[in-house]
């Protein structure tokens, strides 16, 4: 079993030197990390849509650029946050659009791609971008050529399914895919999602990005990697990645 890359969720809890050393020792590359997401332990899941937190967001972008540059990470994901009840919908949207324009421009200057991720609002009530269609409307309004979707198949399944149809509809906007099965958010093969069908379809669609394994292993990590054996490409072709769960 061979994984060639990693993704990590919270950069602020990691020391760059330690991560760089671990990547080198294990012959891995880092392909994605998240922007700072506010007070995670306090329930925040991003600050990009929070009016009044713009300075914090911009500082986080600078921090993410330093972090990604040092670790040669080509893309950064933005969790946009929970819509604050005290703000109007228009205010929340304007704040998010302005912040994403800022981040996309700054990251582009550093040669780093910006992603946003729709997250299901069943498990995280109030998450502002809970559907792919809404996220794409934000991308359109931002109008940047450096802003893409992170398409999490588990979140899409929770919010309505149509996994392949949704991919095909928005594939030009999708730069990164994540997997987990439903119910339980465990490894592929433990639930209702037909990943053999989906992986074959993604190959037919010539998907070129990474696929992050953002799931909760149902047993020890190494004990449940068998699902990937038939899906990993042979040497010389793209391989899937293993990532941390949110």
Cite the ranges covered by each PLM segment:
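Extracellular interaction modules
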Residues: 1
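Hydrophobic residues in well-ordered beta-strands that form the structural core
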Residues: 30-32, 116, 151, 213
């Amino acid at each position: 079993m061979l994984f060639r890359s990693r993704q990590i969720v919270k950069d602020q809890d990691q020391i760059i030197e330690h991560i760089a050393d671990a990547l080198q020792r294990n012959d891995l590359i880092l392909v994605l990390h998240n922007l700072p997401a506010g007070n995670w332990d306090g329930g925040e899941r991003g600050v990009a849509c929070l009016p009044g937190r713009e300075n914090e967001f911009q500082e986080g972008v600078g921090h993410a650029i330093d972090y990604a540059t040092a670790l040669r990470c080509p893309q950064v994901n933005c969790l946009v946050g929970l819509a604050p009840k005290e703000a109007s919908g228009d205010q929340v949207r304007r704040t998010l659009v302005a912040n994403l324009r800022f981040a996309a421009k700054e990251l582009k200057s550093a040669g780093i791609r910006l992603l946003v991720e729709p997250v299901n609002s069943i498990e995280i009530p109030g998450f502002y971008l809970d559907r792919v269609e809404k996220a794409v409307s934000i991308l359109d309004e931002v109008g940047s050529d450096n802003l893409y979707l992170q398409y999490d198949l588990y979140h899409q399944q929770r919010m309505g399914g149509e996994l392949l149809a949704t991919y095909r509809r928005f594939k030009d906007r999708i730069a990164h895919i994540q997997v987990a099965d439903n119910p339980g958010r465990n490894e592929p093969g433990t639930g209702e999602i037909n990943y053999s069908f989906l992986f074959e379809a993604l190959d037919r669609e010539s998907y070129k990005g990474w696929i992050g394994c953002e799931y909760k292993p149902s047993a020890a990590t190494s004990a449940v990697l068998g699902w990937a054996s038939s899906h990993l490409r042979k040497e010389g072709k793209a391989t899937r990645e293993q990532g941390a769960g949110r």
